[in-house]
Amino acid sequence: MGDIWTWLISFFFLIALVGIIVYQLVCLADLEFDYINPYDSASRINSVVLPEFIVQGVLCVFYLLTGHWFMTLLCLPYLYYNFHLYSKRQHLVDVTEIFNLLNWEKKKRLFKLAYIVLNLFLTIFWMIYSALDDYED
């Protein structure tokens, strides 16, 4: 029964990450179609970057503490990428450069979204597997 709770908690962490990344993509799309000015778009995106990094870090530590080594190893590249961006001070969107880097910023977030959705599908699979395994016992 404990594994189901572990997968359920990680499911909600991943849903939060998907929501944050989709919010960033919507802000970039609004900027692309001129619904929002660059300053507002950059401030909205920058306000959720650190929570995204924190949620991802907590999720990776959560997998480590619960003994799910495969999922921990699967989360490490994304965590390393976030740490690399943060240490080089490239994690925030610059207001003056946002139009020049718009396609790159969208592409980065689409790759992040695909990576998180893959983790989400694996989490759903293991949650269902754990529920069926507990049902058989």
From Swiss-Prot:
The keyword Transmembrane applies. Keywords: Membrane, Transmembrane, Transmembrane helix. It is a multi-pass membrane protein. The chain crosses the membrane at residues 8-28, 53-73, 113-133. It is found in: Membrane. GO terms for biological process: vesicle-mediated transport. InterPro entries: Cornichon. It holds the Pfam family Cornichon. One of its GO terms (cellular component) is membrane. Its main location: membrane. It comes from the Eukaryota. Disulfide bonds: none annotated. PANTHER family: CORNICHON-RELATED. Belongs to the cornichon family. This is Protein cornichon homolog 4.
